[in-house]
Regions:
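Catalytic loop of short-chain dehydrogenase/reductase
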Residues: 139-163, 167-176, 188-189
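Alpha-helical segment proximal to the catalytic Tyr-Lys
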Residues: 128, 172-173, 244
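Substrate-binding pocket helix/loop in short-chain dehydrogenase/reductase
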Residues: 99-112, 138, 216
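Short, small/polar-rich loop/turn modules that mediate ligand/substrate recognition or access, typified
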Residues: 175, 180, 246-248
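Conserved glycine-rich cofactor-binding loop
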Residues: 9, 16-17
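Short C-terminal tail/terminal secondary-structure segment
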Residues: 18-19, 148, 236, 247-261
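Conserved glycine-rich Rossmann-like NAD(P)H-binding loop of the short-chain dehydrogenase/reductase
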Residues: 32-47
Length: 261
């Protein structure tokens, strides 16, 4: 199935590496003009240079810090004063790992800004043009821990759950405007973030990182870690006209890891 996003403008959070980068590259390959958002200007500048422009696309980037909401808000206000977005990908790096007992109120507030507040604010700004044009796509990058929490990811579990619940509520309100909103429940994917998590876990358990990664792979019915390109393919479909009747849902992409259904 060929997916064409020619003429669409996409804003992709956390897109200097990992899943976010794969999403940006896949949307651009399908014809979308993509604006990347992340902290690393050097990485984003190189990615933008590599993105295709054969379908008339124009790409760019914004250097942002999702953990600094006042600064982020000012940047988004300035961006949306001059630009419109058809496809919004709410994606950021996750908060620091740790159990609920290890996290204080300040860390909870930082995680709230990072995973929830920025996504809500950006979505509200993007919706103005989406509603005017009677077309839009909002996709939240969440986690399978929304359904089956991991105790060492207490902040991610909590705030991503809030994001998914908010997304479901908003999806009902904007469906009449031909705007879809879906959340993706992310399993294990081969990214720097995953490497960081299993390396930290290995240090706590006094075992090798390879042992922890192997145990992760063994938990997955498909017996492997996912490729970010596989993730990006799902996002590209949800961003397309072919997915026009899919909204308000949470879609796991985890190789069968979730035991619930």
């Amino acid at each position: 199935m060929e997916i064409l996003l020619t003429g669409k403008n996409a804003l992709v959070g956390g897109s200097s590496k990992g899943i976010g980068r794969a999403i940006a590259e896949r949307l651009a390959a399908s014809g979308a003009s993509v604006t990347l958002m992340a902290r690393s200007e050097d990485l984003m500048a190189r990615i933008v240079e590599s993105l295709p422009t054969d379908k008339g696309q124009s790409h760019g980037y914004l250097v942002v810090n999702f953990s600094d909401f006042p600064a982020y808000k000012a940047q988004m206000d300035a961006f949306f004063a001059k630009n419109t977005v058809d496809i919004l990908i709410n994606n950021t790096q996750g908060p620091a790992a740790g159990s609920a007992l290890e996290k204080g109120i300040e860390e909870c507030q930082t995680a709230f800004d990072l995973l929830f507040k920025c996504a809500v604010y950006t979505s509200n700004l993007a919706l103005t043009a989406m509603q005017k044009n009677s077309w839009g796509r909002i996709i939240n990058v969440a986690s399978i821990t929304v359904r089956e929490p991991l105790n060492y990811l207490a902040l991610s579990n909590s705030l991503r759950s809030a994001l998914v619940s908010w997304g479901k509520s908003l999806a009902i309100d904007i469906a009449k405007d031909n705007i879809t909103l879906n959340s993706i429940l992310t399993g294990y994917f081969d990214t720097e973030r995953l490497t960081q998590l299993y390396t930290q876990k290995a240090e706590k358990m006094n075992v090798t990182a390879e042992k922890v990664r192997g145990d992760m792979e063994a938990q997955v019915p498909m017996q492997r870690i996912g490729d970010p390109e596989e993730y990006a393919n799902l996002v590209c479909f949800l961003a397309s006209q072919q997915a026009s009747y899919i909204t308000g849902t949470s879609i796991p992409i985890d190789g069968g890891l979730l035991k619930s259904y």
